[in-house]
């Protein structure tokens, strides 16, 4: 099994983790803080020497590997159609973003600002979350089509929940960038799903 295949599977797990956490926050108003931190931290890794540096280690995206196994596995279990919709939508949105050099330049500048702010604030501070959310709202969401988030209205009305959801969508886009850079494609998911599941189960 090639290193590139392993890296691609890792990138796809990163997308799955962001989608899973979006769903969790939208439904329950909260999610595992460590997983949230790991996904958001990946946004700030803009010049990795190797793919694994984006997430730090495989344990950082364990929820993503678990979601990958559940979604692509052939054990007959009920699939999460909503999570699949988020993953497909994020990949499609990133493909559009990749063609917009003007937006990519602005994206780099805004992410650098957050990196500087992190010297003074914790990554999960509401101010940082709000700034990450605004990057998604200002630069990525308008490219369209907009990703419709389903969840509990009581939670979705709360500003902090909205910030977390949008910040996680930004993290999902970051993982999609890595997936594309590693030549990830829909056909690979279809034809290599069994190998991807076997690999994901190791983590």
Curated annotation (Swiss-Prot):
Q: Which cysteines are joined by disulfide bonds?
A: none
Signal peptide start and end residues? none
Membrane topology (UniProt): Peripheral membrane protein
Q: Localized where?
A: Cytoplasm; Cell inner membrane
What InterPro entries is this protein classified in? HflD (IPR007451), HflD-like_sf (IPR035932)
Per UniProt, the keywords (alphabetical) are: Cell inner membrane, Cell membrane, Cytoplasm, Membrane
Q: Give one Pfam hit by family name.
A: DUF489
Q: Where are the bilayer-spanning segments?
A: none
Mitochondrion among the record's keywords? Answer: no
User: Source organism's superkingdom?
Assistant: Bacteria
GO CC, alphabetical: cytoplasm; plasma membrane
**Which family does the UniProt entry place this protein in?**
Belongs to the HflD family.
Name of the protein this chain belongs to: High frequency lysogenization protein HflD homolog
Organism lineage = Bacteria, Pseudomonadati, Pseudomonadota, Gammaproteobacteria, Aeromonadales
């Amino acid at each position: 099994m090639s290193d590139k295949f392993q890296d691609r599977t890792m990138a796809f797990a990163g997308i799955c983790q962001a989608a899973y956490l979006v769903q969790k926050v939208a439904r329950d108003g909260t999610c595992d803080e460590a997983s949230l931190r790991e996904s958001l931290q990946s946004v700030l890794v803009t010049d990795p020497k190797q793919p694994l540096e984006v997430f730090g280690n495989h344990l950082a995206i364990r929820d993503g590997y678990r979601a990958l196994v559940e979604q692509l596995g052939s054990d007959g279990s009920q699939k999460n159609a909503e999570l699949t919709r988020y993953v497909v939508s994020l990949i499609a949105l990133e493909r559009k973003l990749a063609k917009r050099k003007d937006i990519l330049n602005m994206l780099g500048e805004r992410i650098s600002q957050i990196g500087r702010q992190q010297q003074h604030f914790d990554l999960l501070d509401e101010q940082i979350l709000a700034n990450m959310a605004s990057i998604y709202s200002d630069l990525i969401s308008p490219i369209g089509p907009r990703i419709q988030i389903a969840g509990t209205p009581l939670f979705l009305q709360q500003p902090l929940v909205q910030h977390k959801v949008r910040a996680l969508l930004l993290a999902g886009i970051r993982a999609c960038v890595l997936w594309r850079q590693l030549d990830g494609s829909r056909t690979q998911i279809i034809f290599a799903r069994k190998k991807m599941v076997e690999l994901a189960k190791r983590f």
